[in-house]
């Protein structure tokens, strides 16, 4: 046979060699077990015996050349010396001369055919050449010669295991398994046979069998690192992360530098971090993620999940660091790029956000979350065509992507197409009936077209409130002492304590409350604080109030905070607009609960006692229904604090232009076709007059063209209309009122902040009353200022009032220059008096509570009775009314289901758009199955 000269494998077989180079337990020529190669039946002279002993010593010291010379000298005298032939073969084997070694062992076998030692060495040489079958046959002959010869059994177990692995790799799995079992039968203590059986059973997904085999392998060889590693993989895949980590720890205790085990440990620790974080222990989750990086410092998934965790902890600088590290070590991690975009978007760095989303899409072109988020940014920027394209692509990529439909609804709403917006919200709700965003945005959108001709909008709010309330546990008792005239604690919760519409109407109470008798606790969920936020905080703290930053905190936890602060009357200022805390109000943490300012309709929540309004916005004889009990202030329900950045009132532009300019800075959703029809009548009746309209979507050409086309169809030439996009700086926005002479209010959803701004800048506003609160806000504002003559009862009066104002430019100019003073001296800007009035209302509410008169408790008891009566009736056929569907899962809280980020359009009354943050963790990695 042809031999290849090579090194003898330093593997399992060589470990069976004794200190003298012979296989442990070498055989005598008779086949009986004794000293290796010793021939007892042949008398040798003392010198030969001494020479062989010396040669064995030399060989044990790896002096194979010298030992070989002595063996050969002995063989010259006695060519049948078994011990010398075997010693010679071993020396040749160690010198990589396999052919000569084989000849020497063969000569020994010729002398003694039953010599197990020589047969075993021949088997080793066969195995070195990859001739596993011949090796096995040689080992079997050795065992047949001496069944108790352990080295042969060990070597046979090794080669049978190798044969089994070869068969398995060739696709003959069952034959491979058979060979492993044959190996175990030959040597029941051979750990690799058990281990490789474990690998096969793992691949066959017979994990109980695999685990049993790995355990036996580890039992036979306690230092078997690979067995511990693969046991860890099985436990990890079963979700038993603690057991998996324990196995990896044992593995690494045996082999500290075992890279696969270190990587697997990092994977398991990352999974465990995500598990405990989802269970509520985010700090422990972070600790596990960091520990994972100790085992694999470039493990991108641990870095990504640290980014997610720090984002949830509102430590956004840290989140950015770990998202960037995750992307650095895994350039295919689109989720990290996406989440970076969310953070930059929330920081108003829209260009950077777009860059991140586009990078994510370059990695995953159909990544629905980034497509959606890019659409959100474009919507915020007013780029409606680009936004629609992105969101539609997100829906194509994932047709069941509910929140994309919600965001499409926001886009349609911003573009002024309310019917399409409502359709999109309803499509979202078909996919995800529990979508809080879509449910609330739908209610908000319905206000833009509701004229109070029926109760549909009330019923929609009521039904939403009843379903939503079931998601939260309600408190029904409080420790607050029922002393009617004691000092009260008033809580205000809002996300809008920054330069935002609501902030102009909450500033007066924060500044003028009698903190001795009405201590203020502010719960601020502001996404991005600004100078106004800081001013509010300083003012409240200086007067002895409390300021709680609650952004990102679970609504139930906020409820607990409110109870700990002993709040007596809790006032929410947001309604169904973005980032609201209606979930907190649903828990009913305070004895008395109130809604005010932020939303022009009922919340629908049975847990809220009162809604603050006035007799002008909600006349006592109005037919509009509310879930809450209405409480009316003596003047307007609003108190306006002008912006210090407003600047001076400019002269009427009509004086220099020679024509009158009408205008509106309301959002496009309020400017319905019906409104445009009335405005067209006005401009047609006032020669040479112009119209100026400013809103965010006008930076989009298609929106501009659509708007002008509608006016042209109504008889108004496009050349008479000026369209302005969003103006970012507040000072510049206020100065833009210098471009108009007369402000035209919208209906049936009137302006609020825009009306106050126009009046403060000297621009009179024409408004029209109606049958619902949203329609009458302008009525409340103008009457409070003393401009009742600008309040119309119908469209004809509205047109006539505008025409009359425009007909006398001198009077218009005089009114303009006196309007700010008139407004400033009116109750609308008298913060001290307004606050005394609202404190009086709070005191009345508290007295009613002390007397046991609690509207929400009565309402909830009635609902409980109705539910009990309904459940006691067994219908003939069971059916489910979608409008009465009971929601059993937690709401998304205006955010993505995994990570809680929300995009907020910067509008007076705003819709919630959802941004997605990718998956919590990516569990890819080498599972460590070694064979």
Swiss-Prot record:
GO molecular function terms attached to this record: peptide-O-fucosyltransferase activity; protein O-acetylglucosaminyltransferase activity
Annotated coiled-coil segments of the chain: none
Domain of life where this protein originates: Eukaryota
GO cellular component: cytoplasm; nucleus
Role according to the record: Probable O-linked N-acetylglucosamine transferase (OGT) involved in various processes such as gibberellin (GA) signaling pathway. OGTs catalyze the addition of nucleotide-activated sugars directly onto the polypeptide through O-glycosidic linkage with the hydroxyl of serine or threonine. Probably acts by adding O-linked sugars to yet unknown proteins.
Keyword Nucleus carried by entry: yes
Region of interest (Disordered), ranges: 1-38, 864-931
Ranges of Low complexity composition bias in the record: 25-37, 864-884
Uppermost EC category: transferase
EC number: 2.4.1.255
Pathway: Protein modification; protein glycosylation
Cytoplasm as UniProt keyword: no
Family annotation (SUPFAM superfamilies): TPR-like
Ranges of biased composition (kind: Basic and acidic residues): 1-15
Chain residue ranges for the region called Catalytic region: 436-931
Name of the protein described by the UniProt record: Probable UDP-N-acetylglucosamine--peptide N-acetylglucosaminyltransferase SPINDLY
One GO biological process term: negative regulation of gibberellic acid mediated signaling pathway
Pfam families: Glyco_transf_41 (PF13844), TPR_1 (PF00515), TPR_16 (PF13432), TPR_8 (PF13181)
């Amino acid at each position: 046979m042809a031999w290849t000269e090579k090194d003898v494998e330093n593997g399992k077989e060589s470990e069976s060699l004794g200190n003298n180079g012979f296989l442990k337990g070498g055989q005598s020529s008779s086949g009986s077990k004794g000293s290796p190669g010793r021939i007892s039946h042949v008398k040798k002279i003392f010198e030969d015996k001494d020479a062989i002993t010396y040669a064995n010593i030399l060989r044990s010291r790896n002096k194979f050349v010298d030992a070989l010379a002595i063996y050969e000298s002995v063989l010259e005298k006695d060519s049948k010396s078994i011990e010398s032939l075997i010693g010679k073969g071993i020396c040749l084997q160690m010198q990589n001369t396999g052919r000569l070694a084989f000849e020497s062992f063969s000569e020994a076998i010729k002398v003694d055919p039953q010599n197990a030692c020589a047969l075993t060495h021949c088997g080793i040489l066969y195995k070195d050449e990859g001739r596993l079958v011949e090796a096995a046959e040689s080992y079997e002959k050795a065992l047949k010669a001496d069944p108790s010869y352990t080295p042969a059994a060990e070597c046979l177990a090794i080669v049978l295991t190798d044969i089994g692995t070869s068969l398995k790799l060739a696709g003959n799995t069952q034959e491979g398994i058979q060979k492993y079992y044959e190996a175990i039968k030959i040597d029941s203590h051979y750990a690799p046979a058990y281990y490789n059986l474990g690998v096969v059973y793992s691949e066959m997904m017979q994990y109980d069998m695999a685990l049993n085999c790995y355990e036996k392998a580890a039992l036979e060889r306690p230092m078997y690192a690979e067995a511990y590693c693969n046991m860890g993989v099985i436990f990890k895949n079963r979700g038993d992360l603690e057991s998996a980590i324990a196995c990896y720890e044992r593995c690494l205790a045996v082999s500290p530098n075992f890279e696969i085990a270190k990587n697997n440990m990092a994977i398991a620790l990352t999974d465990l971090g995500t598990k405990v974080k989802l269970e509520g222990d985010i700090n422990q989750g972070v600790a596990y993620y960091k520990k994972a990086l100790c085992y694999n410092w470039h493990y991108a998934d641990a870095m990504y999940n640290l980014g997610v965790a720090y984002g949830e902890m509102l430590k956004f600088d840290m989140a950015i660091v770990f998202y960037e590290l995750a992307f650095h070590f895994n350039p295919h991690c689109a989720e990290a790029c996406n989440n970076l975009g969310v953070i930059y978007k929330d920081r108003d760095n829209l260009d950077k956000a777009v860059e991140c989303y586009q990078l994510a899409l370059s990695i995953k072109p159909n990544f629905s979350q980034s497509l959606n988020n890019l659409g959100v940014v474009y919507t915020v920027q007013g780029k409606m065509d680009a936004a629609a394209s992105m969101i539609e692509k997100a829906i194509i990529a994932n047709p069941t992507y509910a929140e994309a439909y919600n965001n499409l609804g926001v886009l349609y709403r911003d573009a002024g197409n309310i019917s399409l917006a409502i359709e999109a919200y309803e499509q979202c709700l078909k996919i995800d009936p529990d979508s809080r965003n879509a449910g609330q945005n739908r209610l908000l959108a319905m206000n833009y077209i509701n004229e109070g001709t029926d109760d549909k909008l009330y019923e929609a709010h009521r039904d939403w409130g009843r379903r939503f309330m079931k998601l939260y546990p309600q408190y029904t008792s409080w420790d607050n002492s029922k002393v009617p005239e004691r000092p009260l604690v008033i809580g205000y919760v809002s996300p809008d304590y920054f330069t935002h519409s609501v902030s102009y109407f909450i500033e007066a109470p924060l500044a003028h409350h009698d903190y001795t008798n009405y201590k203020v606790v502010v719960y601020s969920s502001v996404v991005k604080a600004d100078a106004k936020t800081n001013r509010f905080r300083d003012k409240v703290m200086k007067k002895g109030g409390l300021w709680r930053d609650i952004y990102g905190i679970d609504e139930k936890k906020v409820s607990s905070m409110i109870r700990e602060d002993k709040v007596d009357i809790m006032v929410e200022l947001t309604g169904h607009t973005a980032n609201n805390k209606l979930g907190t109000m649903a828990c009913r943490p305070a004895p008395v609960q109130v809604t005010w300012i932020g939303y022009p309709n009922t919340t629908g929540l049975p847990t809220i006692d009162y809604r603050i309004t006035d007799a002008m916005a909600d006349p006592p004889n109005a037919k509009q229904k509310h879930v809450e009990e209405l409480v009316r202030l003596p003047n307007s329900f609003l108190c306006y604090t002008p912006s210090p950045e407003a600047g001076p009132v400019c002269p009427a532009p009509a004086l220099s232009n020679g024509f009158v300019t009408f205008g509106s800075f309301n959002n496009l959703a309020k400017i319905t076709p019906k409104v445009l029809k009335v405005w067209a009548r006005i401009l047609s009746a006032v020669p040479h007059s112009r119209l100026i309209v400013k809103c965010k979507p006008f930076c989009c050409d298609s929106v501009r063209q659509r708007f002008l086309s509608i006016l042209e169809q109504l008889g108004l030439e496009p050349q008479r209309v000026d369209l302005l996009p969003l103006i970012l700086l507040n000072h510049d926005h206020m100065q833009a009122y210098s471009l108009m002479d007369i402000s035209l209010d919208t209906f049936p959803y009137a302006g609020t902040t825009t009306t106050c701004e126009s009046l403060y800048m000297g621009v009179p506003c024409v408004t029209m009353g109606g049958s619902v609160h949203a329609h009458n806000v302008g009525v409340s504002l103008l009457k409070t200022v003393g401009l009742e003559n600008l309040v119309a009862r119908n469209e004809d009066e509205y047109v006539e009032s505008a025409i009359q104002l425009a007909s006398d430019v001198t009077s218009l100019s005089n009114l303009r220059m006196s309007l700010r003073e008139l407004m400033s001296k009116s109750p609308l800007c008298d913060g001290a008096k307004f606050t005394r009035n609202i404190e009086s209302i709070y005191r009345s509410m508290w007295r009613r509570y002390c007397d046991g008169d609690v509207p929400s408790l009565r309402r909830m008891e009635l609902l409980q009775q109705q539910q009990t009566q309904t459940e006691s009736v067994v219908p003939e056929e069971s059916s489910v009314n979608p409008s009465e569907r009971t929601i059993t899962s937690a709401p998304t809280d205006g955010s993505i289901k995994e990570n809680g980020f929300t995009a907020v359009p910067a509008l007076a009354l705003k819709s919630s758009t959802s941004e997605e943050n990718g998956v919590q963790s990516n569990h890819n990695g080498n599972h460590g199955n070694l064979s």
